[in-house]
Curated annotation (Swiss-Prot):
This is Large ribosomal subunit protein uL2. GO terms for molecular function: rRNA binding; structural constituent of ribosome; transferase activity. It comes from Rhizobium etli (strain CIAT 652). Keywords: Ribonucleoprotein, Ribosomal protein, RNA-binding, rRNA-binding. NCBIfam families: rplB_bact. Belongs to the universal ribosomal protein uL2 family. PROSITE patterns: RIBOSOMAL_L2 (PS00467).
Length: 278
């Protein structure tokens, strides 16, 4: 996929850089594999804002994507690659030999007509195939990696992302993630071969605030431009720096403050993403 730029007929067109999606399927998604999606506007069941700066945006239908890939040893054919408004990656419609259909995350270099298969045994190392980490060759680029067997892929699912299998140790697989973290995952967890599609997503420029609003994001107001009644960083004469380490509107440290608290899985992390990247 290439990037598209536009003639500078307006200031926002001058800045605009988007992904060229002309090669994707142009019709509607498979109705049996979609669900309705209700907008929350960032509000909970009491009507109170629990996630700020969310609201509006184009209406979406939710595509049911198969992250588990537990249809073992049944070959599937990729019918088409589709756009999915609910994620940054593209999705692939797979038709299996028994007539069933499913959406999967499309890896790079997967095209219509390609064959994919998931198995509990070793299968070909080619994009879209899924097998346990214990059978994947060391050094392979993988995505949609399970953290618990049978739970479905959780690691490396967004556009252009991937993990690398760098070793094995006593039934565990050692993964290197995009963040620089190295961690252990059970060797019986499933993973798919290849890197996730749409790597150019990192290079897009919306060009104008309105295009961001179409995505359901509202204007994000900085605390430093508010009044003291509204934010700990507010107030002061003229422009100020906030006068303290960054905090949320409720006074909790933010911007780099570590929030991880799951001590039971600390032992699975061999190298923290916070260590200096070599």
């Amino acid at each position: 996929m290439a990037l598209k730029t536009f003639n500078p007929t307006t200031p926002s067109q001058r800045q605009l850089v988007i992904v060229d999606r002309s090669s994707l399927y142009k019709g509607k998604p498979v109705k049996a594999l979609t669900e309705g999606l209700t907008k929350s506007g960032g509000r909970n069941n009491l009507g109170r804002i629990t996630a700020r700066f969310i609201g509006g945006g184009h209406k979406r239908s939710y595509r049911l994507v198969d992250f588990k890939r537990r249809k073992f040893d049944v070959e599937g054919t990729v019918e088409r690659i589709e756009y999915d408004p609910n994620r940054t990656a593209f999705i692939a419609l797979v038709s299996y030999a028994d007539g069933e259909q499913a959406y999967i995350i499309a890896p790079q270099r997967l095209a219509a007509g390609d064959k994919v298969i998931a198995s509990e045994k070793a299968v070909d190392v080619k994009p879209g195939n899924t097998m346990p980490l214990q059978y994947i060759p060391v050094g392979s680029i993988i995505h949609n990696v399970e953290m618990k067997p049978g739970k479905g892929g959780q690691i490396a699912r967004s556009a252009g992302s991937y993990a690398q299998l760098v070793g094995r140790d006593q039934g565990m697989a050692i993964l290197r993630l995009n963040s620089g973290e190295q961690r252990l995952v059970s060797g019986i967890c499933l993973a798919s071969i290849g890197a996730v599609s749409n790597p150019d997503h990192a290079n897009i420029n919306d060009g104008k605030a309105g295009r961001t609003v179409w995505r359901g994001k509202r204007p994000h107001n900085r605390g430093v431009v508010m009044n003291p009644v509204d934010h700990p960083h507010g107030g002061g004469e003229g422009r100020t720096s906030g006068g303290r380490h960054p905090v949320t509107p409720w006074g909790k440290p933010t911007k780099g403050k570590r929030t991880r608290s799951n001590k039971s899985t600390d032992k699975m992390i061999m190298r923290s993403r916070h260590q200096r990247k070599k």
